[in-house]
A protein has these predicted regions:
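Short, well-ordered beta-strand segments in beta-rich or mixed alpha/beta enzyme
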Residues: 2-9, 38-65
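An amphipathic, aromatic/His-enriched active-site/gating alpha helix that lines ligand/cofactor pockets
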Residues: 24, 28-37, 53-88
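Intrinsically disordered, low-complexity acidic/polar segments
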Residues: 15-17, 59, 96
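Non-catalytic surface loops within mature trypsin-like serine protease
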Residues: 10-12, 56, 91-93
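Glycine-rich beta-strand-turn "strand-cap" elements at beta-sheet edges
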Residues: 40-47, 74-100
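Short flexible/disordered coil segments
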Residues: 1-7, 66-73, 95-100
C-alpha cells in the first residue's frame, strides 16, 4: 500500500477556490479510481492537506497520469503559496518496526 500525505500553505483569499477544486477530486473522481482506498482533503486555517491511500504504486501511477489530475492540479497550484505541495510518500512494504 502507498500512502501520500500532501500539504501546502493556502494563499490569501484562495480557500474557497481550493476547497471547490479539492471537492471535485475527492467526491467526483477518487471514488471511481481503481486502487484508490482513501482520498480525503482538509483545510485547517491556512493549511491544505490531502491524505491518499493507494493499493499499490501502479494504481498511484495511473492516477498521476489521469486526465482529471492534469486538469485540476494546475488549478490547485494557483491556490497555494509558491504553487508547491510538500508530499510525503509511505510505502507500507518498506516500513521498519521496532518493539519497545
Amino acid at each position: 500500500m502507498i500512502i501520500a500525505i500532501v500539504k501546502a500553505s493556502i494563499k490569501d483569499n484562495k480557500h474557497k477556490a481550493l476547497r471547490e477544486i479539492a471537492n471535485i477530486l475527492q467526491f467526483e473522481y477518487a471514488p471511481n479510481e481503481e486502487g484508490c482506498e482513501q482520498y480525503e482533503s482538509f483545510i485547517d486555517g491556512d493549511t491544505f492537506i490531502t491524505i491518499e491511500r493507494w493499493r499499490d504504486q501502479a494504481a498511484l501511477d495511473i492516477h498521476l497520469e489521469a486526465e482529471h489530475v492534469e486538469k485540476y492540479v494546475p488549478k490547485l497550484r494557483e491556490c497555494v503559496v509558491d504553487g508547491c505541495f510538500d508530499v510525503q510518500f509511505i510505502n507500507t512494504n518498506d516500513i521498519n518496526f521496532a518493539r519497545i
